């Protein structure tokens, strides 16, 4: 259904990444250090919890420990433009929360129950990762709110303020070798790559907007 694609699939991928990191850390007996240099919110923070230690910049965005589902309702629009919606399913609940159909109370209740289950699971991950480091009540920490890196440190959501180069050199010495694995340039950036600065800026804006949407912000 539309709800399952927009809600469960995203959380499932994020939780899978978290689980795989923890499995590899345990298998290889390695300590995991996470650096949130930009944003570690919502699913990003869930993944960050795979770290034995979490560091961030003072201006990083941290938290948003919650579950969100959003969509639009187009029922009045398709009536105005004379469009007839035709849906054929095997299973009466397959079209749950279809944006072209009226919302049903029972569908909203079902969605809310799923959100509560996922939120509970998210909270358990955070509590397992941060345990006694958390310094505020559940009501405040798990409300879906997000904070700056500096405030997140005060709340116990991260261990300290600092970037990867600084922290790793402090821990392992000035001669430590840091290998960086960067994401390859996206299809959009390659397609819009140009000597025209305005085109490049537009590509960057579109990519940044897409990234923030993934964090649920």
Model-derived regions, located:
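N-terminal organellar transit peptides
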Residues: 1-57, 68-217
């Amino acid at each position: 259904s539309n709800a399952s694609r927009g809600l469960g699939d995203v959380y499932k991928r994020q939780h899978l990444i978290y689980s795989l990191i923890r499995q590899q850390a345990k298998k290889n007996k390695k300590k995991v250090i996470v650096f949130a240099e930009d944003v570690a919110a919502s699913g990003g923070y869930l993944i960050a919890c795979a770290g034995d230690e979490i560091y961030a910049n003072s201006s990083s965005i941290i938290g948003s420990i919650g579950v969100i589902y959003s969509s639009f309702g187009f029922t009045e629009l398709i009536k105005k433009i004379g469009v007839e919606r035709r849906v054929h399913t095997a299973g009466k609940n397959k079209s749950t929360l279809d944006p072209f159909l009226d919302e049903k109370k029972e569908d909203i209740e079902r969605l809310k129950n799923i959100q509560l289950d996922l939120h509970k699971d998210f909270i358990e991950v955070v509590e397992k990762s941060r345990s006694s480091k958390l310094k505020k009540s559940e009501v405040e920490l798990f409300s879906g709110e997000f904070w700056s890196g500096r405030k997140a440190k005060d709340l116990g959501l991260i261990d300290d303020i600092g970037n990867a180069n600084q922290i790793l050199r402090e821990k392992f010495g000035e001669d430590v070798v840091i290998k960086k694995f960067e994401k390859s340039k996206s299809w959009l950036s390659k397609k819009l790559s140009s000597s025209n600065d305005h085109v490049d800026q537009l590509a960057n804006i579109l990519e940044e907007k897409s990234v923030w949407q993934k964090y649920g912000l």
